[in-house]
Swiss-Prot record:
Component of the proteasome core, a large protease complex with broad specificity involved in protein degradation. The M.jannaschii proteasome is able to cleave oligopeptides after Glu, Asp, Tyr, Phe, Trp, slightly after Arg, but not after Ala. Thus, displays caspase-like and chymotrypsin-like activities and low level of trypsin-like activity. Its EC number is 3.4.25.1. The keyword Transmembrane helix does not apply. This is Proteasome subunit beta. One of its GO terms (biological process) is proteasome-mediated ubiquitin-dependent protein catabolic process. It is an enzyme of class 3 (hydrolase).
Length: 224
């Protein structure tokens, strides 16, 4: 079953935080159907998720998880733990395996007792807890290459953000079904922060600025 119809989404863990990033292009065959598609959602105070695949199926899952998270908080007075949220979604997807939701999901969250958590789920309910990083969608092979080359478990949040953005940028340059901007979220013990477009542009601009190379005596002789 091929569910990678378009999109690139990435998630990674660094410095006791989770970083999620997605592109904004929605495709209908070879047509760019939407240039501002929302693929990054806040589920609870400490949980966010990305979607790839069928838009209708993914949006139905988002609505369901938001409702379940609210019910959990009403009943217990606590936020739903990331593992419980991912397990709930895994059960929902598996129960619909005969008529599956055509979507791939990344769930990132912060557990106040266990720290940063990252999960990937397939359309049939298969769930993996990721200890480093993950990617979904048609641009994921390209994103994985960037993540593999640049990932360090001890990197700072700022370095993790730049790595996630680099992975998205590379995928958007090579995958025709990914593009039209980036959505970004960071999840820490302080909760979910979804970045504004202006904030993302500022980070991207800072990444373009390259430090000037020092001129050595040898290079000065060559230039004469």
């Amino acid at each position: 079953m091929d569910v990678m119809k378009g999109t690139t989404t990435v998630g990674l863990i660094c410095d006791d935080a989770v970083i999620l990033a997605t592109d904004k292009r929605a495709s209908l065959g070879n047509l760019v159907a939407d240039k501002e598609a929302k693929k990054l959602y806040k589920i609870d105070d400490y949980i966010a998720m990305t979607i790839a695949g069928s838009v209708g199926d993914a949006q139905a899952i988002v609505r369901l998880l938001i409702a379940e998270a609210k019910l959990y908080k009403m009943r217990t007075g606590r936020n739903i733990p990331p593992l419980a949220c991912a397990t709930l979604l895994s059960n929902i997807l598996h129960s619909s395996r005969m008529f599956p939701f055509l979507t791939q999901i990344i769930i990132g969250g912060y557990d106040l007792l266990e720290g940063a958590k990252l999960f990937s789920l397939d359309p049939l309910g298969g769930m993996n807890e990721e200890k480093t990083f993950t990617a979904t969608g048609s641009g994921s092979p390209i994103a994985y290459g960037v993540l593999e080359a640049g990932y360090d478990r001890d990197m700072s949040v700022e370095e993790g953000i730049k790595l996630a953005l680099n992975a998205l940028k590379s995928a958007m340059e090579r995958d025709t079904f990914s593009g039209n901007g980036i959505s970004l979220a960071v999840i820490t013990k302080d909760g979910v922060k979804i970045f504004e477009d202006e904030e993302i542009e500022k980070i991207l601009d800072s990444m373009k600025a390259k430090p000037k190379k020092k001129t050595t005596k040898r290079s000065r002789r060559k230039s004469k």
